Design a protein with these regions (language model features):
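Active-site region of glycoside hydrolase catalytic domains
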Residues: 2-179
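C-terminal/domain-terminus segments
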Residues: 176-194
Length: 194
């Protein structure tokens, strides 16, 4: 539901998600074609919540239901991943992976899941030029290349010391190609005219 972000605040819903992950691992964990399971896709943490101005970008359709909406904290996300790992790994051999999304906080995972027990964890990062723009990247070819070479590449290289890293999503959508400042990927669908 647009503008409603309260799942992590509801223990029953969190437990339901963990139970679904456990059932998926139990059912598919030994399948030859399975690479791994990712517990969450793009959990929105505090910095991204602020960068993307979520409550304005995705205005709540139901204001009452949206009351109390908030980003997922890193503390919650770390605990969720630990719990999910324990539930998933009980049904999967070590050659299957648990893939954790970085929550758009690529550099925040250096001290996490470094014990031998977690040798089959992969860190997934999703990179979008529109997010780089929202964080101040110059809207020029030179600006995009500088961002990739001087920020993104060194960060991924650094994090590869701690985890195998995959870039599970990458999008080149950008303001330069659109011919106008999209303010970090906004459009007429968000009420922003180009």
């Amino acid at each position: 539901i647009s503008g409603v972000c309260k799942w992590a605040q509801n223990p029953d819903e969190v437990e339901f998600a963990l139970s679904v992950l456990e059932r998926l691992a139990k059912r598919y964990g030994n399948r030859k074609g399975l690479f791994g399971i990712q517990p969450l896709n793009e959990p929105i943490t505090e910095n991204m919540w602020e960068t993307m101005d979520i409550q304005n970008r995705y205005a709540p359709a139901d204001q009452e239901m949206a009351k109390g909406s908030a980003p997922i904290t890193m503390k919650f996300l770390r605990q969720f991943y630990l719990d999910a790992y324990d539930r998933i790994s009980a049904y999967m051999p070590k050659d299957k992976y648990v893939v954790i999304h970085d929550g758009f906080e690529l550099m925040e995972w250096k001290d996490f899941m470094q014990e031998e027990k977690y040798s089959n964890v992969i860190l997934d990062t999703h990179q979008y030029l529109m997010v780089a723009e929202a964080r101040g990247c110059s809207q020029t070819i030179e600006g995009y290349l500088k961002y990739i070479r001087e920020e993104l590449e060194p960060q991924i290289t650094e994090m590869e010391k701690y985890f195998p890293v995959i870039c599970g999503e990458w999008c080149l959508f950008n303001s330069l190609a659109c011919g106008c400042d999209t303010k970090g990927g906004q459009s007429v669908l968000n009420g922003v005219e180009g």
